[in-house]
Amino acid sequence: MHISKKYLSLTYKNFVMTTLFYNIKELFQVRENNNTILKGDEMKDFPSIKNAFLLIENDLIVDYGSMENAPTKFDESVDVSGKMILPTYIDSHTHIVYAGNREQEFVDRINGLSYDEIYQRGGGILNSVEKLRKASEDELYKDTANRLEELIALGTGVIEIKSGYGLSLEAELKMLRVIKKLQENYPVKIKATFFVAHAVPPEFKDNQAGFVDEICSVMIPEIAKQGL
């Protein structure tokens, strides 16, 4: 169980730092067994302990339970009276690196147009591609960082971020560099996904095989070379 916290311990070799969070109003997702996968009716269960404590040792949870069983030895403590603690959210599918918006397409959908109809006239992903290619890397980073901070504030602790709105080597590298910079500047775990093959760019409209070859022989090797 991973729980987001403001108070981070400094971990050194042979050095142990313990932090006790006490008087927790309610501690969620505590289970007797260590199930790594929940499915079906199991997902309806959201176990908790009221009036709880949580003990952290060098950034790892080592103990938790009712306040009546709280440890008496620790290095620092945090009174969490009136507050709840729960594991951070894992957001496994996002497209938060983008430029502009497609709000007009929302109106088009309300008016009855299908996604294919919108796509055929240059909307959908192709609309996002055009805007992203024109945006600077600094602009993309700033806007994406703002979106990421909103997600963190709402409790996200692990996030996957896709590229795929560039559809060219230069634009995809730009997106992946933005994601790498976010990885370096924010404490949450960020996983990058190279997601270019979900649409065909205008320059390869009549040569889809050529686009696949470009991905395999040019894009993937260069992205691997740059460690993105």
Q: What function would you assign to each model-found segment?
A:
Residues 66-76, 185:
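Short, glycine- and charge-enriched coil/turn segments that flank and shape catalytic ligand pockets
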Residues 12-70:
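N-terminal metal-binding scaffold of metallo-dependent hydrolase/deaminase domains
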